[in-house]
C-alpha cells in the first residue's frame, strides 16, 4: 500500500491542471526521442492501454468502489457500514482486488510517462537551489533592518518624550491662562455685583465668559481658585434670581426696559430659550390651576356647606335653597378667570413684543430669532393654543362630572359667550395700544433697543395668518354648549306654537297667545345679541319658528267652495280665513318690529328672518286669492253687461244737464261697496288689503275702457251716458284704493279716454295721450263705433261674443297681436268694398289705417 501511495503521489498532475478519468484512460503519447528503450516502453503502454481503460471503467461502475470517489468520504463511516452490511472477508477480498487493479494501472502509467516523471524530479532539484539562494538573501535583509532599527529607536523615544512634555506644558499654560482669566473675571464680577441692577448685564456677560473658561476642563482641586469657583457659583445663582425677579416685575408693570434688561441677562447667560419656555409653561400651569379652581364644585359649595356639617358620603350637589347663591358664585369665579387670562395674556404678549424688538448689542441678533430658529412657533401661539386646549379639556371634564355646571354652561351659554367676547375685545384693545406704550417708554438704557420692526402689526389678536383664527380657537371650547343652547332655544320657540295649535284645532291663536310667541322670539334675540354668530344662529331658529307658524296656520285655511263666494254674508270658512290672515299679519308686523328694534343687528340675520317673513306674506296672499279671484270675476261679469244696454240713442231734448249713469254702473258701485263692507273690512291689515284690491281696481278700469271702446252703435245720447259712466267709474273703484290716483296708468287712461268720446275722429287720431297712455288698439277699436256697419269690428268679423273677444285679449297681451287682428278686419272691409265695386271708403277708414301704420311703426 505504501508503494501504491508513493506511486500516486509521484504521478500527481502538475499544479494548475486537474486530471480526469479520460486522462488516465487515454494517456498522451510518450516522447519518442531517447532511444529504443523508450520506444519499447511506449509500445508496452500502447498494448496495455485498452485493457487498462476497461479496468478503470469497471472500477468506476462498481458500486463497491463508488463511495471512494465522493468528496466527503469518511473512513470510519465506511468501515462501520461495511461491518453491518456484509461479511468482512468478502469486503476485504473485494478491496484487495481493487488495490491490485490500481497498482497495475499505476505501474502502466509510470511506465508510459517515465520521461515526464524524470523531468519533474530534475525541476525539483533546481527549485531547491533557488530556495536556498532566497533564504540567504532574506537573512541579509533582516540584518540590514536590525541595523536601521538600532539607529531609529533611540531618536523616536526621545521625540515621544519631548512631545508628551510639550503637550503637558501646553495644557499647563492653558490652565494657567484660564486660572489667570478666572481670577481677573472673578475680581471684575465682584465689582459688577456691587453695582446692582445697573451692572447686571455685564455681570451676566462675565459669568458667560467664566462658563466658557470652565468648559471641557476639570478645575476641581486647584486651591488658588477654589474660593473663586464657589463665589462664581453663588454669583450665577444670584444673577439668575435677580434677573427672574426683574423679568417678573417688568412683565407685571409692563415695563419694556426691565423686561429687555432681564432678557439680555439670560441671553448673556446662554439660557434665554430655556428661561422663556419655563416662564410660558409656568403661566400655562397657573392658568390651568385657576380654570380647575373656578370650576371646582367643591370650592363653589364650600361656603354653603360650612354652615351645616355633612356626614361621610354627603353629596356636594347644590340644594334648591342655595342654587341662586351657587350660580352667582360660579359666574363671579368665571369673571375672575377671564380677568386672570387677560392679565396673563398681556404679560406673555408683552414678553413677545420685547423679544421681537430686542437685539443683542454685540451680535445684533434679534432675540425672537433665537427662540424660533429651530422651527418652533412663536411663544404666544404656543401659549394661546395651550390656553384654549386647557379651557376645552377642563370645561369638558367639569360639565361631565357636575350636572349643575352642565346646566349653567348650556342654559346660560350667552352669558358665558359674553365673557369670552369681552375678553377678546380687551385683548384686541391691548394689542392696538401696546405699541404706543413701547414708544412712550422706549429708551436706549441698558442696551434695550426698541426699534421698529416691519412686522409690528403681526399680532395674534390682529390676525393676518389665513390658516389660523385665534378667536375661533378660543370659542371652539364652547362649541358643545352652543349646540345644546341652540337646541333648547329652538324648543323654547316651538313650545308656545305647538301649545296654541292643538291637534284638531280650528281657530288661530288669540292676541294674547300671539303676544306670548312674539315675546319669546324677542327674548331669544335679545339674549343672543351678545355675539354676532350666536345672533345669526338664533335668527335661523326664529326663521324655523316662523315657518312652523306658517305651516300650522296653513292647515287651518278653508279651501272649500264657500271660501270664495261673494253672494251672501261671510261663511264660517271665510271668517276662519280672515282670522288666519289677521294672525299672520300680526306675526309679520310684530317680528318686523322686533328685528328693527335690535341694535347692531347683523345683516345676514336680518335677511334670514325677512326671508321667512316673505313666506308669511305669500301665505296671506294665497289665503285671500280665492276671494280676490271671485271678486274680480264678478266685477268683469257686471261690466260686460254694458253691452246689454242701448247707447244708440240721440241727445235728449229735455235740456236736463244731469245724465244718469247706466244700470250696470250702479250695480258695480253697489257690489264693490258691499264687498268692502261685508268681506274686506274684517281684515285688520289694510295695507295688505289695498295692495291686493288696487290690482282688482286696475283690472276693472281696464275692462271698463276695453268694453266701452267696443260699444256699437254709439249715439250722442249714448256718449253722454257713457261719459257719466266714466265719471262714476272713478267713484266705483274708490273703495278699492287709498286714492284713485294710486292706480297709475289705468287711472290716467280712464281720465284721458273720456274727452275722446266727443272729439272728431281727426282730433282723436292726433290726441297726445295716444300710444303712451291709451294703447293704439283701444283707440282703433273705438273708431269702429264711428264706421258704417259694413266695417265690422274684429270680434264681429270673427263672429265672437264680447266675452270671448275679451278673453282673447287677455290671452294675447301683446299689442302687436291685437293690431294684426285689427288689420285683418280692415283688410276684410277693403275686400268687401271692392267686391261690391264701391267707389269710396268710409271717412273714418283712412284715419284708422293711418293710426294702424303709426302703431306698427312704433312697435318696430
Curated annotation (Swiss-Prot):
Keyword Phosphoprotein in record: yes
Principal location listed in the UniProt entry: cytoplasm
One Pfam family matching this protein: COG5_C
GO BP terms, alphabetized: glycosylation; Golgi organization; inter-Golgi cisterna vesicle-mediated transport; intra-Golgi vesicle-mediated transport; protein transport; retrograde transport, vesicle recycling within Golgi
Subcellular location: Cytoplasm, Cytosol; Golgi apparatus membrane
InterPro entries tied to this protein: Cog5, COG5_helical, COG5_N
Disease in which the protein is involved: Congenital disorder of glycosylation 2I: A multisystem disorder caused by a defect in glycoprotein biosynthesis and characterized by under-glycosylated serum glycoproteins. Congenital disorders of glycosylation result in a wide variety of clinical features, such as defects in the nervous system development, psychomotor retardation, dysmorphic features, hypotonia, coagulation disorders, and immunodeficiency. The broad spectrum of features reflects the critical role of N-glycoproteins during embryonic development, differentiation, and maintenance of cell functions.
Family, per entry: Belongs to the COG5 family.
Protein name per the record: Conserved oligomeric Golgi complex subunit 5
Taxonomic source organism: Homo sapiens (Human)
Gene: COG5
